[in-house]
């Protein structure tokens, strides 16, 4: 839209936010995925809440956000019937987590994170593929994810496993 209407932003007295995100989608084709003996992808329960909060706090917390905010977010995700909070266990320890929102007409994937020392080893792909395969068996929805454009690694991961760009979201703010 903004490419076709280059004067829109200035005519309305707006400025583009530096942060943009891309929405990607994927069909329902399952992945061929071999089981890895020391890895398990499970729906989380409250017994994993502290490990999940710690991982999400390290990966996603803004400077102004407290651990308590992350704890509340994880607790709500565990209770919400429209939400699935998955964990990736390696030798029984949580090394990854991802949430799926089921409240719309797609399986909306967000918050995928792998612990810092385990990144770059294919665990993010394994977690995403595994939870997608599980959801294909449970419902008839396609998949969607939004990725901050600055998060090049995550964007590359999703494109590598078959997600395709649907649109880019540009946030507009009033000029100060």
Q: Which ranges hold each PLM region?
A:
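Conserved active-site tyrosine of GNAT-family acetyltransferases
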Residues: 8-9, 158, 163
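Conserved acetyl-CoA-binding loop-helix of GNAT-fold acetyltransferases
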Residues: 114, 120-137, 156-160
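A conserved beta-strand-loop-helix scaffold within acyl/acetyltransferase catalytic domains
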Residues: 66-113
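Short amphipathic alpha-helix that is part of the acyltransferase structural core
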Residues: 33-68
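A structural microfeature
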Residues: 17-18, 96, 167
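Acyl-donor-binding surface of acyltransferase catalytic domains
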Residues: 1-39, 172-173
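Conserved beta-strand-loop-alpha-helix junction that forms the acyl-donor binding cleft
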Residues: 1-7, 145-155, 171-176
């Amino acid at each position: 839209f903004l490419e076709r209407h280059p004067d829109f932003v200035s005519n309305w007295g707006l400025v583009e936010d530096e942060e943009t995100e891309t929405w990607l989608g994927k069909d329902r084709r399952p992945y061929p995925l071999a089981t890895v003996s020391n890895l398990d992808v499970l729906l989380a329960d409250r017994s994993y809440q502290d490990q999940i909060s710690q991982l999400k706090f390290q990966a996603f917390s803004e400077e102004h956000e407290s651990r308590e905010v992350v704890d509340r977010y994880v607790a709500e995700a565990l209770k919400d019937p429209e939400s699935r909070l998955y964990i990736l266990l390696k030798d029984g320890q949580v090394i990854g987590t991802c949430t799926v929102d089921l409240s719309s007409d797609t399986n909306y994937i967000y918050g995928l994170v792998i612990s810092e020392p385990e990144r770059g080893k294919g665990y993010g792909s394994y977690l995403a593929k595994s939870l997608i395969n599980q959801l294909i068996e449970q419902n008839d929805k396609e998949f969607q994810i939004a990725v901050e454009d600055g998060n090049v690694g995550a964007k590359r991961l999703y494109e590598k496993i078959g997600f395709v760009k649907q649109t880019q979201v540009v946030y507009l703010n009033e000029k100060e």
